[in-house]
């Protein structure tokens, strides 16, 4: 397969210390003399030779369908008897701690917050007030010291133990989102000029991307917290992990029909008439992301297919794929296998391209 990953631009968002106003503000508020240890990183990527569903799938997985980490408070960690500021409720503080942008590689670290306001003014609590109480010594910070956690009135205290690192995915809790601001566009569809779009309220493309089958795409996103010395390595790891997540989810579908001659509740095959076969495949805990990718790639593999579609069933946490084709049961399974192998090969090639392009 030809090179899919054509180009990448990686741009960290740095503090402009050349601006005296920004420099003085950083020094006054946070005692900063240099860049923060973690920075947001904008990434713009160009892909060629793949369908719209593949780029959409990569975008969705990078944002909220890939395992990531957040900070959370263990049950009983918020010490109610020692926390005397009634405005700083457990839920308020938990939400703030959940959404601290972090760069973590495991779940072994534990932190605590023990803050007392002895002044006559309101005290702002920042992430720099967190102290590590368990886990290996850090080679670099996993969060910036400047994120606001809460506030303390004069004479009040806030005590929290057992702030730990939790693993999950963004579609179940937004704090686990890996990338933010994901967006993609198609470079091989002619667009209206910007002024014309605003004046005539046009969508942008002169032809619908649903019917034009674009093959040249640009995907943009932002990783909120990446260590300064490891920007390229972190971006490369994130992108490769996203490819592996998609490959793993596609491979799990293979296992459903590998022994299709044996009765399986996840796979129903039957003949509609002398020519057509209908397959209904139920995939647990799957989403629109993989459904759309499968549907598009099966259509590409079998252009004369009678029907292919999917339905997500949220209350059952499953996705149901339906295929109807003029073929025997064995031939239909063979065609489905080829379609899935094409998807796996596509993302394996993309993973290889990522290694080649991001040093």
UniProtKB/Swiss-Prot annotation:
Predominant cellular place of this UniProt entry's protein: host cell
Subcellular location: Host cytoplasm; Virion
GO (cellular component) term, any one: DNA-directed RNA polymerase complex
GO BP, sorted A to Z: DNA-templated transcription; viral transcription
The entry's keywords: DNA-directed RNA polymerase, Early protein, Host cytoplasm, Transcription, Viral transcription, Virion
Similarity comment: family membership: In the N-terminal section; belongs to the archaeal RpoD/eukaryotic RPB3 RNA polymerase subunit family.
Database matches in SUPFAM superfamilies: Insert subdomain of RNA polymerase alpha subunit, RBP11-like subunits of RNA polymerase
Protein name per Swiss-Prot or TrEMBL: DNA-directed RNA polymerase RPB3-11 homolog
Induction: Expressed in the early phase of the viral replicative cycle.
Organism field: African swine fever virus (isolate Tick/Malawi/Lil 20-1/1983)
InterPro entries: RBP11-like, RBP11-like_dimer, RNApol_insert_sf
Function: Component of the DNA-directed RNA polymerase (RNAP) that catalyzes the transcription in the cytoplasm of viral DNA into RNA using the four ribonucleoside triphosphates as substrates.
Any Pfam family matching the protein: RNA_pol_L_2
One MF annotation (Gene Ontology) recorded for this entry: protein dimerization activity
Coiled-coil residue windows: none
Quaternary structure and interacting proteins, as annotated: Part of the viral DNA-directed RNA polymerase that consists of 8 polII-like subunits (RPB1, RPB2, RPB3, RPB5, RPB6, RPB7, RPB9, RPB10), a capping enzyme and a termination factor.
Superkingdom as given in the UniProt entry: Viruses
């Amino acid at each position: 397969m030809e090179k899919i990953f054509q180009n990448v631009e990686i741009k960290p968002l740095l503090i402009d210390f050349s601006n005296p106003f920004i420099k003085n503000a950083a020094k006054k508020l946070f005692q900063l003399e240099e860049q923060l240890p973690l920075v947001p990183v904008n990434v713009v990527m160009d892909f060629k030779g793949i369908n719209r569903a593949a780029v959409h799938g990569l975008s969705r997985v990078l944002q909220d369908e890939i395992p990531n980490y957040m900070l959370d408070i263990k049950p009983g960690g918020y010490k109610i008897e020692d926390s005397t500021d009634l405005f700083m409720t457990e839920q308020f503080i938990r939400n703030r701690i959940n959404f601290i942008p972090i760069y973590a590689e495991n779940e072994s670290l534990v932190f605590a917050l023990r803050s007392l306001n002895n002044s006559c003014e309101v005290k702002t609590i920042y992430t720099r007030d967190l102290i590590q109480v368990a886990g290996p010594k850090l080679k670099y910070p996993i969060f910036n010291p400047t994120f606001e956690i809460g506030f303390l009135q004069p004479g009040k205290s806030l005590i929290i133990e057992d702030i730990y690192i939790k693993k999950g995915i963004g579609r179940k809790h937004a704090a686990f989102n890996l990338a933010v601001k994901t967006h993609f566009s198609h470079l091989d569809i002619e667009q209206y000029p910007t002024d014309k779009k605003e004046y005539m309220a046009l969508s942008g493309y002169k032809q619908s991307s649903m019917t034009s089958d674009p093959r040249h795409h640009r995907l943009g996103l932002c990783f909120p917290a990446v260590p300064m010395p490891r920007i390229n390595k972190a971006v490369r790891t994130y992108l490769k992990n996203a490819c592996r997540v998609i490959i793993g989810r596609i491979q799990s579908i293979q296992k459903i029909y590998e022994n299709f001659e044996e009765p399986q509740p996840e796979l129903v095959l039957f003949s509609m008439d002398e020519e057509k076969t209908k397959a209904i495949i139920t995939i647990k805990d799957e989403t629109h992301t993989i459904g759309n990718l499968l549907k598009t790639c099966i259509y590409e593999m079998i252009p004369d297919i009678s029907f292919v579609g999917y339905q997500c069933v949220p209350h059952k946490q499953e996705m149901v794929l339906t295929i109807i084709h003029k073929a025997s049961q064995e031939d239909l399974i063979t065609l489905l296998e080829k379609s899935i192998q094409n998807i796996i090969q596509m993302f394996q090639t993309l993973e290889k391209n990522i290694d080649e392009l991001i040093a």
